[in-house]
Amino acid sequence: MTYCKRGTEGLIYLEDGTLLRGCGFGAKGVRYGEVVFTTAMNGYPESMTDPSYRGQILIITHPLVGNYGVPNPIVRNGILQNFESEQIQIEGLVVTEETDPSKWNSSKSLHQWMAEQGIPGVSSVDTRLLVKKVRTLGSMMGVIASGEHVEDPRKYIEMRYDEIDFTKFTSPKSPIIHQNNSPDIIVLVDCGIKHGILEELYKTGFTIVRVPCKSSADEIMNYSPKGIVFGNGPGNPNILKDLVKNFSAVMEYKLPTLGICLGHQVATLALGGNVRKMKFGHRAINKPVTDISNNKCYISTHNHGYGVYKEDIPPDTQIWFVNPDDGVVEGLIHKRLPLITTQFHPEARPGPNDTTWVFQKFKKMVIKDEGN
């Protein structure tokens, strides 16, 4: 029997019938969600607060998690510098070993943080076995329990991940303004934005106005923006009909537009392309993407379970980036409209900053458009 240092047992269940028992940490309780994994070796506070993980149970493949604890939030200009949102977004966390922290700026342990926010965790389980299951069979629904006796985990799965519009949980209810040196406005359609994206946009010097995910084209254009950004967010893009419709309406104004992650997928759908569920997705901070225009390869951060393939791209677009590992299209450029997209996260957080220049490219598009 596994010795649990906190005296709490836990379990992780996959819908294929796999059931592993280990040690519980964090909050006591039972949660269900889509089981996914990340190969990132660090950056767990950023990953766990990334709204794109909403509705998912996250397995971290690195064997030791919690080493450097959890810092106090640092906020500048209304933007978090060391978290991607104000709360933990994942449904639960699965690790091989949950360790006690040892770092000068740690304010609390991973266990304490998760307990405070009501998120269960399970450790002392074979994460390699779980990841191999997900890689072989694909992402699947699962149940995580900490400190709770669960007879039949299957009964806790209420809905399929692909059927839920998670943006209603991650989008702001009203507009949020980040005033900057320039009065010129960039409207950011916020379906669950990472604060790393906010920070990079703020560095462009423009005032950023975050509007709710389902904002209409008229509501967006009321701000007289110089450019528009459709950011990341959780869930299945194919069920976000209103968002796709609004994207199409916004593009009629021919303003410089940047789509990131979910924004890339929504752009693809709005322009007549297809977006497919991937077998187990890309979730890592060291994924390669190749710029087709110059054959340069960059290392980038990814978090997506849906993808666009070469045969799926919309008319009048050309591939900008592609993942050389599996051929997934990681960026598009429109041939006639001032639109660029990336499936990967050019802001990283966590991850390398090889592609932060994408935001400067967008800034140049906005300035060029102003000069016309």
Curated annotation (Swiss-Prot):
<feature type="active site" description="Nucleophile">
    <location>
        <position position="261"/>
    </location>
</feature>
<keyword id="KW-0665">Pyrimidine biosynthesis</keyword>
<dbReference type="InterPro" id="IPR050472">
    <property type="entry name" value="Anth_synth/Amidotransfase"/>
</dbReference>
<dbReference type="InterPro" id="IPR002474">
    <property type="entry name" value="CarbamoylP_synth_ssu_N"/>
</dbReference>
<dbReference type="GO" id="GO:0006526">
    <property type="term" value="P:L-arginine biosynthetic process"/>
</dbReference>
<feature type="binding site">
    <location>
        <position position="303"/>
    </location>
    <ligand>
        <name>L-glutamine</name>
    </ligand>
</feature>
<feature type="binding site">
    <location>
        <position position="306"/>
    </location>
    <ligand>
        <name>L-glutamine</name>
    </ligand>
</feature>
<feature type="active site">
    <location>
        <position position="345"/>
    </location>
</feature>
<comment type="subunit">
    <text>Composed of two chains; the small (or glutamine) chain promotes the hydrolysis of glutamine to ammonia, which is used by the large (or ammonia) chain to synthesize carbamoyl phosphate. Tetramer of heterodimers (alpha,beta)4.</text>
</comment>
<dbReference type="InterPro" id="IPR036480">
    <property type="entry name" value="CarbP_synth_ssu_N_sf"/>
</dbReference>
<feature type="binding site">
    <location>
        <position position="52"/>
    </location>
    <ligand>
        <name>L-glutamine</name>
    </ligand>
</feature>
<feature type="domain" description="Glutamine amidotransferase type-1">
    <location>
        <begin position="185"/>
        <end position="372"/>
    </location>
</feature>
<comment type="pathway">
    <text>Pyrimidine metabolism; UMP biosynthesis via de novo pathway; (S)-dihydroorotate from bicarbonate: step 1/3.</text>
</comment>
<dbReference type="GO" id="GO:0005524">
    <property type="term" value="F:ATP binding"/>
</dbReference>
<feature type="binding site">
    <location>
        <position position="305"/>
    </location>
    <ligand>
        <name>L-glutamine</name>
    </ligand>
</feature>
<dbReference type="Pfam" id="PF00988">
    <property type="entry name" value="CPSase_sm_chain"/>
</dbReference>
<protein>
    <recommendedName>
        <fullName>Carbamoyl phosphate synthase small chain</fullName>
        <ecNumber>6.3.5.5</ecNumber>
    </recommendedName>
</protein>
<feature type="binding site">
    <location>
        <position position="233"/>
    </location>
    <ligand>
        <name>L-glutamine</name>
    </ligand>
</feature>
<keyword id="KW-0547">Nucleotide-binding</keyword>
<feature type="binding site">
    <location>
        <position position="265"/>
    </location>
    <ligand>
        <name>L-glutamine</name>
    </ligand>
</feature>
<keyword id="KW-0055">Arginine biosynthesis</keyword>
<keyword id="KW-0028">Amino-acid biosynthesis</keyword>
<feature type="active site">
    <location>
        <position position="347"/>
    </location>
</feature>
<keyword id="KW-0436">Ligase</keyword>
<keyword id="KW-0067">ATP-binding</keyword>
<comment type="pathway">
    <text>Amino-acid biosynthesis; L-arginine biosynthesis; carbamoyl phosphate from bicarbonate: step 1/1.</text>
</comment>
<feature type="region of interest" description="CPSase">
    <location>
        <begin position="1"/>
        <end position="186"/>
    </location>
</feature>
<dbReference type="GO" id="GO:0044205">
    <property type="term" value="P:'de novo' UMP biosynthetic process"/>
</dbReference>
<dbReference type="InterPro" id="IPR017926">
    <property type="entry name" value="GATASE"/>
</dbReference>
<dbReference type="InterPro" id="IPR006274">
    <property type="entry name" value="CarbamoylP_synth_ssu"/>
</dbReference>
<comment type="function">
    <text>Small subunit of the glutamine-dependent carbamoyl phosphate synthetase (CPSase). CPSase catalyzes the formation of carbamoyl phosphate from the ammonia moiety of glutamine, carbonate, and phosphate donated by ATP, constituting the first step of 2 biosynthetic pathways, one leading to arginine and/or urea and the other to pyrimidine nucleotides. The small subunit (glutamine amidotransferase) binds and cleaves glutamine to supply the large subunit with the substrate ammonia.</text>
</comment>
<feature type="binding site">
    <location>
        <position position="262"/>
    </location>
    <ligand>
        <name>L-glutamine</name>
    </ligand>
</feature>
<dbReference type="InterPro" id="IPR035686">
    <property type="entry name" value="CPSase_GATase1"/>
</dbReference>
<dbReference type="GO" id="GO:0006207">
    <property type="term" value="P:'de novo' pyrimidine nucleobase biosynthetic process"/>
</dbReference>
<dbReference type="Pfam" id="PF00117">
    <property type="entry name" value="GATase"/>
</dbReference>
<dbReference type="GO" id="GO:0006541">
    <property type="term" value="P:glutamine metabolic process"/>
</dbReference>
<keyword id="KW-0315">Glutamine amidotransferase</keyword>
<dbReference type="GO" id="GO:0004088">
    <property type="term" value="F:carbamoyl-phosphate synthase (glutamine-hydrolyzing) activity"/>
</dbReference>
<dbReference type="GO" id="GO:0004359">
    <property type="term" value="F:glutaminase activity"/>
</dbReference>
<comment type="similarity">
    <text>Belongs to the CarA family.</text>
</comment>
<dbReference type="InterPro" id="IPR029062">
    <property type="entry name" value="Class_I_gatase-like"/>
</dbReference>
<feature type="binding site">
    <location>
        <position position="235"/>
    </location>
    <ligand>
        <name>L-glutamine</name>
    </ligand>
</feature>
